[in-house]
Amino acid sequence: MRSPVRAHPRGFFLLGARLKEDTDDLVDLELVAALLNLPQLEFSEDTLIEARKRPWLEPLPAPFPALASRFIPGSPGSPDIRLIIADPNPGASGRPVYIHMHGGGYVTTSTVIYPIIQRIAYDCQCLVVSVDYRLAPETSYPGALDDNYAALQWVHDNAEMLGVDRKRIAVGGESAGGGHAAALALRARDRKEIPVIFQLLIYPMLDDRTGSTRRAPRCMGRYVWNEASNRFGWSAHLGVRAGSAEVLPGSVPARVENLSGLPPAWIGTGSIDLFAEEDITYAKRLMAAGVPTELAVFQGGYHGFDVIAPSATVSRRFTEGWQSALRRAFATV
């Protein structure tokens, strides 16, 4: 029997009403329960204000590192940028550093940013600098990329003060943050000012054409992040219609023709994530360009499954996979 349609207290449609439909048998069994109480919020101009009101999760207690905020100058003509820093060993020197960009579809801030960066710092024993970049649609491309590059430049220039090794700088993020990280790696390659040793792309948002000029397979994008949300997020970020000919060159990682010379990459996604196909394609293109690349596709995982159901076996395997990749990258320099 199908689950009855239920309304979330905030008025969102619950994904639990979709269980037992045509593609639900593809969801990992341990991930199904988490969908029952998950609000389905389709991103649009009408829902964006409500989405930005969602409360953030509180920081984790000790032994996870405390968090500190710091403001740095933005690019010329741009406002200062807030950085959120997680330091597992204050006062230490010569450490690797991970520059993190949060998810949120380019239009909002991830509500789980605090525990995410605390866990990375603690589990990977690196300084984590998360960039509170400007959001779309208020700021369109290249505003957020300028913020992220300014943060990369600041970390590199202040390595001694931060106690980090400027030869061990990695970039990464989840979802839209993964898209930002890919774009940042491309800019760093093109400008040849700052060496980046690794890009950690966790179910990255890489291609504006998904859901606009290119339809995803029916089994992908049924949960959490769908084609309509993707069109809205990309259009807001780009300042033009997603998938159109007006998209600026270099603004979409998947549209960049030359991927050679980029740092090694780890790309991970769930098999039924809307981004699965574009992530697999990007990984294959990196490999073809001679970029050392590890691709991990986890059966039955929808978008953000590791955050929504962190105790599931597949989620633990996913997290262990990218954490191990980041530690290996830091150890090889």
Predicted regions, residues:
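A glycine/proline-hinged amphipathic helix-loop "lid/cap" segment
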Residues: 1-85, 243, 330-333
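Short beta-strand element of the alpha/beta-hydrolase
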Residues: 94-103
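Short amphipathic alpha-helix adjacent to the substrate-entry channel of hydrolases
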Residues: 111-130
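Alpha/beta-hydrolase active-site loop
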Residues: 139-160, 322
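Gly/Ser-rich "nucleophile elbow"/oxyanion-hole loop immediately N-terminal to the catalytic nucleophile
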Residues: 156-171, 191
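Short beta-strand/loop motif that positions the catalytic acidic residue
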Residues: 267-269
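Catalytic active-site module of serine/aspartate enzymes centered on a nucleophile-bearing elbow/loop
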Residues: 312-333
